Amino acid sequence: MHAKSLTELRAALDAKECSAVELAQHYLKRIDAARDLNAFVHVDAELTLAQAKAADAALANGEAGPLAGLPIVHKDVFVTRGWRSTAGSKMLANYASPFDATVVARLSAAGMVTLGKTNMDEFAMGSSNENSAFGPVKNPWDTSAVPGGSSGGSSAAVAARLAPAATGTDTGGSIRQPASFAGVTGIKPTYGRVSRYGMIAFASSLDQGGPMARSAADCALLLNAMAGFDERDSTSLERADEDYTRHLGKAWAAGGDAGKPLAGLRIGLPAEYFGAGLADDVRAAIDAALKTYEALGATLVPVSLPKTELSIPVYYVIAPAEASSNLSRFDGVRYGHRAAEYRDLLDMYKKSRAEGFGPEVKRRILVGTYVLSHGYYDAYYLQAQKIRRIIAQDFQEAFKSCDVIMGPASPTVAWDIGAKGDDPVQMYLADIYTLSVSLAGLPGMSVPCGFGAGANAKRPVGLQIIGNYFDEARMLQVADAFQRATDWHVQEPAGV
């Protein structure tokens, strides 16, 4: 059952091969058996089965939508009524939200059944899921490796077939990079496509929610439910609703050849994504994927994104600056961790934050406070915003000669747990290919396209596909065509 896609699972429900309750019980057993992966921070079988019973009733009454009865897990950055919502932090270890995030509410309204809340880097700050207050997550493909971050619990859960779908968030690559490391499909929509209401904020001008699943087709189904205008989110974009599945399985150009479904598609290859720093085994997997696209009729076009290397310093000025503001609300007064002993109000603030936040969060708060301080705001924050605009302009120049841009999602496969913990800069460099997409607010996704070599032969490689603004449906079409021609996305870790 766990090897089926969302569409196949829904067909099984419609054919009464199983009920939503039986499906939920199946996945709950798998989650319990895979506790060593540490992919979950909160599972509540009673809550899950109550939702499954409601889904069965809707299915029986003929009132169910296309996602009714299908299980999903939520990254623990989305507040969820009835469940703890921790953001991977001791600061919120026992926080119970009185409301659902818009993403959670929309998926619940579509009839999906929540299996649990997944582990993550604290406040979404990390690239390996080692920064969680609840311990690191293990990669199901190789349990000595990280699953990527910050949505590492979600990527591990989908990869290990503990859930057919998951939500994640992407601030600088936190859907695409863990999707790459865990061999699953994940999409970061255009900034503003998916509501941030109820998503615990890290960097408000960058944070964006999105789905993770086995395939592009499954992600398209999920995005249909997740996307849309939300008046409660000031950054939500008011656009007509779309069917993100509408191009799947169709030729790129009208009247196209079935043998060459992507004839007419121009794929931009940035020289900056294939230079020094890209591991040979990752390059080999990406090159093989590009050959598949050529066989499907696409044309490869050289493009340039000259400010790519500046995306790291720009991101690590802007994101910490916004984080220092967003996280100032966690002071032990209204909610969150409060120190047990303190002399006065100021001492309570200091001790509560010192005890509640982990090392990486403290590091970024300090950096953010510094770059926003008097005398440094112009030199750092404003300059970073200017370069951010230039990075976005570089993408628009590239899209004049191509329809999508492709390259690696990460310069390497997943590294060993603990390998980069003492060197935050090396950890930051792992996001070199994803940060600029986030800074520009563009949609991007990662699809499985192979594995590493030698000692890394069990560690997946992800192909990053970048689209222009609001072009998710076409981007998903391009990913789906690749997955119809290959089987990387249906391969499973040993023992699954």
From Swiss-Prot:
It comes from Burkholderia mallei (strain ATCC 23344). The keyword Cell inner membrane does not apply. GO terms for molecular function: ATP binding; glutaminyl-tRNA synthase (glutamine-hydrolyzing) activity. NCBIfam families: gatA. The active site is at K75 (charge relay system), S150 (charge relay system), S174 (acyl-ester intermediate). Belongs to the amidase family. GatA subfamily. This is Glutamyl-tRNA(Gln) amidotransferase subunit A. Keywords: ATP-binding, Ligase, Nucleotide-binding, Protein biosynthesis. Its EC number is 6.3.5.7. PANTHER family: GLUTAMYL-TRNA(GLN) AMIDOTRANSFERASE SUBUNIT A, TRANSAMIDASE. The keyword Iron does not apply. InterPro entries: Amidase, Amidase_CS, Amidase_dom, AS_sf, GatA. Pfam families: Amidase (PF01425). Allows the formation of correctly charged Gln-tRNA(Gln) through the transamidation of misacylated Glu-tRNA(Gln) in organisms which lack glutaminyl-tRNA synthetase. The reaction takes place in the presence of glutamine and ATP through an activated gamma-phospho-Glu-tRNA(Gln). Heterotrimer of A, B and C subunits.
